[in-house]
Amino acid sequence: MSQAIAEQAATLWGIEPHALQLVARRENTVYRAETPEGPRALRLHRPGYRSLAELVSEMEWMEALTTAGMQVPRPSTSLGGQWIEMVGETPVSVLSWLSGARAGAGGRLDV
């Protein structure tokens, strides 16, 4: 997924495109976005990997966990009031940024 898609997506949340920094290319392509409200994670979801209903369900679940007091990324709605926006065929979401340690080798946390 391209930087151009990320830059176009950023504007849907009122994020300045120059504020994006690529941080991961895995299941999603993730950019860190600096905003006046604090850092955000802009996620470009792989087209066709998950349905729109599945992505919305994920946002609803994270919102419910946040409301219940859990420390999880909180979904941000776009300027159009949506949790998921489409840029062409690419679903996009934005979440609050939670700092933390990277997972160890094999995706395990070394504790």
Q: What are the functions of these language-model segments?
A:
Residues 2-16:
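A short, low-complexity linker immediately N-terminal to eukaryotic Hanks-type protein kinase catalytic domains
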